[in-house]
Regions:
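Domain-level signal for soluble alpha/beta catalytic cores
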Residues: 1-391
Length: 391
């Protein structure tokens, strides 16, 4: 791939930002059938203009639209296709679903319940068909109002495959290999359209890779008759096939352990939950050396991620974006704390191969989230740290 200056950015964020209250209110009315598409679109446009201007004023050299056109980051694919076997009237799912509210605890929803595609595990009623390119729509508007490059996030094949009920869809797809091959073809078309429109930085969201170090997730795969090692290799192959042949475009891949969070009833503060546990050690050598993406955006905000030792396995042509700042904790990191952790990481990977970001996005439409003020304080701390470490 030809070099792109965005390959070496020292600062990043993962995509989603805290939705303004007014936008969340319009989203809720739209889901209940009480607001039109036009009203929702106008509210989204207004909020996106504002959040892009704020990112620029806070010193970010790359911006996103905050994912303000999505309920969840996973809609970057599910809203683009038809063919999944989903129940009718799922608009209110986000208001009604039952989530674990216990602080500082593993928290997973019931993936087998009737809900939206990919948010829950759905089969296919027919082969998927592309009906729109939501990331392209997002990029065109974001870049039209931005003074700096706009970054777009797209859900990767691994998560899509993990949330596909293949065993109930064998009359449509021959199995996971057939399904994933089709997903790659669909997403390559979406990416090609983004690149043609001028997008220079595309982030693949791949939270499912940490399933391959998490015992609960591995047991779940095996219970479905799947071979985790085969799934792992298929996903790497698919992620690489997705991005080949787009010179001059920066591709990042984001890996995390889930972005669940809740409110501590004792303190009233936002505190973490999580979906998976396990360090990168067991997958690092294969994953870091086989993926072709220029930027590896890695969650590193808690002990669940393990130490920095696996970074010694990162090839010399990649940047590791350290996700050191928590998006699911009201506690504020300090510049000194972040500099200390970057220094620790640099013992295993040279400082010129490191960058800094939050550990994940700041949350979807139904998430318990930081306040906007808390989010900007955290983003400002990242900017200040980057300026001190890399000048």
């Amino acid at each position: 791939m030809a070099a792109n200056p965005l390959d070496n950015l020292r600062i990043d964020h993962i995509g989603s930002l805290v939705r303004p209250a007014q936008l969340k209110e319009v989203f809720a009315r739209f889901d209940r059938g009480q607001a039109s598409k036009e009203e929702l679109s106008q509210a989204q446009d207004q909020a996106i203009r504002g959040v892009i201007a704020q990112q620029e004023s806070h010193g970010y050299p790359i911006v996103t639209d905050g994912e303000f056109r999505r309920h969840s980051f996973q809609e970057s694919f599910s809203e683009c296709v038809t063919g999944f076997d989903v129940p009718k009237n799922i608009g209110l799912y986000y208001e009604k679903r039952d989530l674990n509210e216990t602080p500082l605890e593993r928290a997973e929803q019931n993936f087998e319940e009737a809900g939206p595609a990919i948010i829950t595990r759905r089969g296919a009623a027919e082969r998927l068909k592309v009906v729109r390119n939501l990331p392209l729509e997002e990029y065109r508007y974001a870049q039209s109002v931005a003074k700096v490059p706009a970054k777009i996030t797209i859900l990767g094949p691994d998560r899509i495959a993990q949330r596909f009920k293949w065993e109930a869809s064998l009359n449509v797809y021959q199995g996971l290999d057939d399904f994933v091959e089709h997903i790659v073809a669909i997403e390559r078309q979406m990416i090609a359209e983004l690149v043609k429109a001028g997008c220079k930085y595309i982030q693949i969201d791949a939270p499912g890779y940490t399933a391959y170090v998490d015992k609960v997730s591995l047991d779940r795969m095996r219970s479905r008759g799947e071979d985790p090692e085969r799934n792992f290799q298929r996903s790497i192959d698919a992620d690489n096939a997705l991005i080949v042949g787009f010179p001059g475009v920066t591709f990042g891949i984001h890996i995390c352990r889930g972005n669940a969070r809740t409110i501590d009833p004792q303190t009233g503060k936002l505190v973490p939950q999580w979906h998976r546990e396990g360090s990168y050690d067991a997958i690092a050598e294969k994953l870091f050396n086989t993926l072709k993406h220029q930027r590896l955006l890695l969650e590193y905000d808690s002990d669940r991620a393990g130490g920095f030792e696996p970074l010694r396995l990162v090839p010399k042509d990649k940047i590791v974006v350290l996700g050191l700042v928590s998006t699911k904790n009201s506690d504020m990191e300090t510049v000194d704390d972040l500099k200390r952790r970057i220094d620790q990481a640099s013992k295993y990977l040279p400082i010129d191969q490191l960058a800094l970001s939050p550990q994940c996005g700041f949350g979807g439409i139904d998430s318990k989230v930081l306040s906007e003020a808390e989010m900007w304080r955290k983003l400002d701390t990242i900017v200040e740290t980057v300026n001190q470490v890399w000048n």
